[in-house]
Amino acid sequence: MLERSEPDTALAYSRYDPDIRRTISFRLLEKQRDLKLLWRWMNQAHVVPQWKMAKPIEDIAAYIDINLADPHQDPYIGLIDGTPMSYWEAYWAKDDVLGRYYPAEKKDRGWHMLVGEPSFFGRGIAPAVIRAFTRFLFLDDPGTQKVVGEPSVAARRLLRYAPACAFEEQGEIDLPDKRAKLMFCYRERFIQQFGL
């Protein structure tokens, strides 16, 4: 059985979602607190094909160190009603490898994510958590007019949710590690559909 984490005083985002009748929150990843959790998630059978991080805990610790030291991105843990369930990496697209594949603006943001807890699959919450993280990025910097994504063409489930989250397909691109769909979510369209 999943346990709620200890109460968080440093949530970066927290909002009740009436569509799923649950509270969605995000907090910065903390290495000491989250290492075993992220290691377990990276080794889940449903995560391995996309992330390719089924590695010893020492490798995940090094991965966390690199991400925490990287000024172009921030790692987050996603929670539903206080229970950790997902991992997110928010990045500045212009400073990311993706920024070489389209004319990135200075304030464009992007994210990578995984749902680590299998018990959260098939519950109809994926669009809600995607919208919540996208909203968080728009709120985090009012200058951000576009949130971008580059899911693998093989990530059919994630691609299926894109239109319900105001993401529009821009075409396919060949990144160093995958063939991907370039996706844009514009602030104005997001606000029209979901508000901030």
From Swiss-Prot:
Pfam families: Acetyltransf_8 (PF13523). The keyword Transcription regulation does not apply. One of its GO terms (biological process) is siderophore biosynthetic process. The keyword Protein transport does not apply. Keywords: Plasmid. One of its GO terms (molecular function) is N-acyltransferase activity. Pathway: Siderophore biosynthesis; rhizobactin biosynthesis. Belongs to the IucB family. This is Rhizobactin siderophore biosynthesis protein RhbD. It comes from Rhizobium meliloti (strain 1021) (Ensifer meliloti). The gene is rhbD.
